[in-house]
Amino acid sequence: ERKESVDFSNPYYEAVQYVIVSADSDIATADDLKDKTIGVQLGTTGDFIAEEYTSNVAQYNKAVDAVNDLVNGKVDVVIIDKNPALVFETKFEGKVKAIEGAQFGFETEEYAIALPKGDTALADAVNGAVDELKADGTFDELVKTYIEAE
């Protein structure tokens, strides 16, 4: 639908959703998510996915608050992007575990920049700039600072 009104840059990042559960949880499949209380960061992909499984969705402004509530038994699972999920698994070592979303049937999503329809010069410039950021390592540093960090 969006492709009808805008063009997109080349994808610059691929996101995968993960499920964070308590370390002793037996939740392992999509069916296990049904009727659970799922914590999500408001407005994220995890938020939209959770609504497919339950009406018990707890929305948070910050992902860390959702994980804290998981640790404290207020939610059953948290659905979140891979990188922050792995950071939380380390931060809350022994209390939570992060499970790949593919195990639950979650698909990957690509991030791209929306551009004015038909502006190939701008698309070429944006794609070139992203390629440069990736080539010199800046992109990886940005991911580490702004996506992996919480």
Where do the model's predicted regions map?
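Acidic, polar ligand-binding/catalytic clefts
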Residues: E1-D32, K97, Q103-G105
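A ligand-binding cleft/hinge motif common to bilobed small-molecule-binding domains
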Residues: E1-S5, D76-E107
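Short, charged, surface-exposed secondary-structure boundary motifs
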Residues: K3-S5, I49-A50, V67-K74, E109
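Conserved functional loop/turn residues at catalytic and ligand-binding sites
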Residues: T37, G73-K74, G137
